[in-house]
Amino acid sequence: MPRRRVIGQRKILPDPKFGSELLAKFVNILMVDGKKSTAESIVYSALETLAQRSGKTELEAFETALENVRPTVEVKSRRVGGSTYQVPVEVRPVRRNALAMRWIVEAARKRGDKSMALRLANELSDAAENKGTAVKKREDVHRMAEANKAFAHYRW
């Protein structure tokens, strides 16, 4: 491994409509085959629907949904003396957001609604109300960490 300087992470530009870096990241995660304008229109239309349902602004509603899906702990495999343990570790803030967004997009893609914008709006509104597939995924991850709390001393 070369011992060169560590290259810093690139800053992503905030999205044009709301000026939010978090939303820009969400658009990038939703984007397929480099079709950013399509992804943006899906996200904006989903946020509009979400805002009408919740009575909050688009960004507030999105932030609430994201907050309810963010995991605080996860398990990582750690090999100790021939056996592999699932060790609970705290999730870094950047990864917390990335996982939450990824889970919301995955859950929305699996839904059976007509358009992707509607699926995304429904998943986000479910997440805002602490229900839905993405929230269930977070609960499963937390349950795994809780079950493997005994191996927490193997943390590195």
Curated annotation (Swiss-Prot):
Entries under Gene3D superfamilies matching the protein: Ribosomal protein S7 domain
CDD domains: uS7_Bacteria (cd14869)
Keywords: Ribonucleoprotein, Ribosomal protein, RNA-binding, rRNA-binding, tRNA-binding
Pfam families: Ribosomal_S7
GO MF annotation terms: rRNA binding; structural constituent of ribosome; tRNA binding
Biological process annotations from GO: translation
GO cellular component annotations of the record: small ribosomal subunit
Source taxon at top rank: Bacteria
NCBIfam families: rpsG_bact
Family indicated by similarity: Belongs to the universal ribosomal protein uS7 family.
Subunit structure: Part of the 30S ribosomal subunit. Contacts proteins S9 and S11.
Protein task: One of the primary rRNA binding proteins, it binds directly to 16S rRNA where it nucleates assembly of the head domain of the 30S subunit. Is located at the subunit interface close to the decoding center, probably blocks exit of the E-site tRNA.
HAMAP family reported in the protein's UniProt record: Ribosomal_uS7_B (MF_00480_B)
Protein name: Small ribosomal subunit protein uS7
Lineage of the organism: Bacteria, Pseudomonadati, Pseudomonadota, Gammaproteobacteria, Enterobacterales
Gene that this polypeptide is encoded by: rpsG
